[in-house]
Amino acid sequence: MQEMMDAEEKVLYNHLECVKQEAQLITVEGEIITRLEHAMSEGESYDMKEYLNTAEEIAEQKLKMYTALLEDVKRFKTKYASKL
């Protein structure tokens, strides 16, 4: 029973960390999108390559983060299916 409780806490902690990291990434995304939109609408120069690289890095971070969370959830459900 203690093992299952520890596993529950681990899944919950990992999910919470994903939510925190997602919030930070959303802030960064909002900033880069706003800067690019402003530059485009004002006819100012902008670095599309930098924007694309940042967007790619953020997307990869999110995929990695949520893939790990999904694996944790599936592992938990498989291991404790009879107790859920």
What do the predicted segments below correspond to?
Residues 1-84:
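Extended, charged coiled-coil stalks and adjacent low-complexity, Ser/Thr- and Lys/Glu/Arg/Asp-rich tails
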